């Protein structure tokens, strides 16, 4: 599951926020080492008792209380389903654009909307047909993406001056090419990308208009690095460059009125913020990892599998994304501003000149994305919805509900706010993991009453409602502590560290609350 398109794109926003490619990969690697440790620990009951997360979680949250964290985890998975479905839709959109002989664009347009709808329908077909119907595809998804990544690295290296020259291009991506000058709201900065010589701009003219439509009739002017432009309203800016076959145009860029003076966090907190976001990438899987580890042969096998398979794979596949994007800056003449850098493989492949190569490669993307999306983002939420109301919601109905929610979250917007989403997810799911681990290791010392996990009146019912008040209270307070920085600026750093804030707070509070709500049962080990 580490080999997927979101992993390919992980380093993109880190680099565009000012980090170097080495710093981005180090943060990804370190964050994955950190999150792998609790994933290994939380996978322990899966191996020992052979139980999935919705059953294991009953010990801490109650026989019915587990539905709350399961639903939170399910809603997050619905979001990821929507994002991956949008990516799959982009691949279909690229195929349609190629068949119609028009340039591919990754924004919201007719082809991409049609592609999204088609990919969603294909996904729902396999949900209704049952996950067994797609198992034959799951064996090919990771190898297909790995093979594609290797081929693109070879292509990028052979088509340019070598790996060093390619990676040097990351410096061009660390700020926007079209932006307001910091501290001067009337000064528009134009910094088109440059060729491999480091001197020749890839664009020579620019146009400014008050709307996207009016760019067609706008006057084109020679580019200077600084342009006096009164910032009295939103504007649209576009760059272009003459070529033997006509003009290459950048995508139109919208600039609103300049923001207030820069209040961005210091460099140290930028690293911490991205570190938290990268931990949040696996926040959902860290909670439900026992769904997978229950199939492991031993604790040693699940430990080795996670530590060997996760951090290194994430770093390597993220590196592929960085390298291929940087190579695209040198190879494709229509990539003339940093904002147009093709960070996702769909956009890279769509720029190849051979229609058959584009169609074949995008079909490979479809297969890989489809199998990964259903395995990682449909099974868990569909099961959670079904467990909540088993009389009314079957597994298939839960899968369709997952698909509907995946549309409602508007993934075409979320995909551009991935860092903010990951930090929010961290604040929601970190507390759940903290409670699970505090209960299993700190209180029960890994001892569970297996039969009791299936008894509505057993040791994990706690009360007539089947809800453990200690867990729910610790969860609410942990989430509130992690997310309070969203509304109170003075506590912003608590939000920047949302996974750690929520995890530690909820674990400690649960340990304090447990004996208070279980005075008659404090001596039991299960």
Residue spans of the language-model regions?
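Membrane-embedded translocation segments of transport machinery
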Residues: 10-43, 66, 151-174, 258-406
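Membrane-water interface regions at transmembrane-helix termini and the short interhelical loops
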Residues: 13-18, 43-45, 60, 68, ...
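Transmembrane helix-loop boundary segments of multi-pass membrane transporters
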Residues: 15-30, 97-110, 132-141, 305, ...
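Juxtamembrane transmembrane-helix boundary signature
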Residues: 27-59, 71-86, 324-328, 371, ...
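Helix-loop-helix connectors at the membrane interface of multi-pass transporters/channels
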Residues: 54, 58, 64, 88-111, ...
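Hydrophobic alpha-helical segments and their helix-loop junctions in multi-pass secondary transporters
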Residues: 85, 89-98, 146-174, 255-260, ...
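Membrane-interface loop-to-helix entry segments
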Residues: 118-119, 123-159, 167-173, 306-310, ...
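C-terminal membrane-solvent junction of multi-pass transporters and transport-like membrane proteins
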Residues: 137, 144, 165-171, 435-512, ...
